[in-house]
């Protein structure tokens, strides 16, 4: 039922039985998976994820402006929208860029005392390994402002009202993922 509700064809019973056997037999960090060609079932921590076919790497830098929405195959829907709570102060005409992990980036999440590597921040946020290269990073020139929907980084724009800024903004990432099942 779970696969069909997502519009996917169930695998042969023998393939599904083998996947279930691997799930029961695996321990710790093992991540059994079932590849069907059009989707993949994979365990991460205590959940089974139904993932669309891997669309390949994401590496192009994209421009986004406050109020903008971008749909990226294999990544999802990314928007920069106003928030009523604390956020990133931007002028409506500022041009920002969405980039992807390259390695070595650091962020001090807003409200935290220390900066950490993005790898560590994403692990602590529970982002599955296969999604970590797809988390959109919001930059203003060379300054990292936010990590997908993980949260904003402490920056020159966090919580500081600029004279051209009308309201705070937040980066919202809705990943392309069929679902996770506990």
PLM regions: where:
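AMP-forming adenylation/ATP pyrophosphatase catalytic core
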Residues: 1-182
């Amino acid at each position: 039922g779970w696969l069909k509700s997502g519009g996917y064809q169930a695998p042969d019973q023998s393939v599904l039985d083998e996947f279930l056997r691997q799930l029961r037999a695996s321990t710790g960090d093992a991540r059994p998976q079932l590849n069907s060609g059009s989707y993949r079932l994979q365990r991460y921590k205590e959940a089974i994820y139904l993932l669309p076919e891997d669309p390949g790497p994401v590496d192009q830098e994209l421009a986004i402006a406050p109020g903008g929405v971008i749909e990226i195959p294999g990544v999802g829907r990314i928007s920069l929208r106003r928030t009523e709570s604390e956020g990133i102060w931007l002028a409506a005409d500022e041009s920002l860029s969405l980039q992807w992990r390259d390695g070595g980036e650091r962020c001090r999440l807003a409200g935290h005392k220390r900066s950490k590597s993005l790898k560590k921040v994403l692990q602590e946020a529970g982002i599955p390994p296969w999604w970590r290269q797809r988390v959109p990073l919001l930059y203003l020139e060379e300054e990292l402002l936010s990590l997908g929907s993980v949260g904003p980084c402490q920056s020159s724009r966090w919580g500081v009202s600029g004279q051209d800024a009308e309201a705070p903004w937040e980066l919202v990432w809705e990943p392309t993922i069929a679902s996770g099942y506990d």
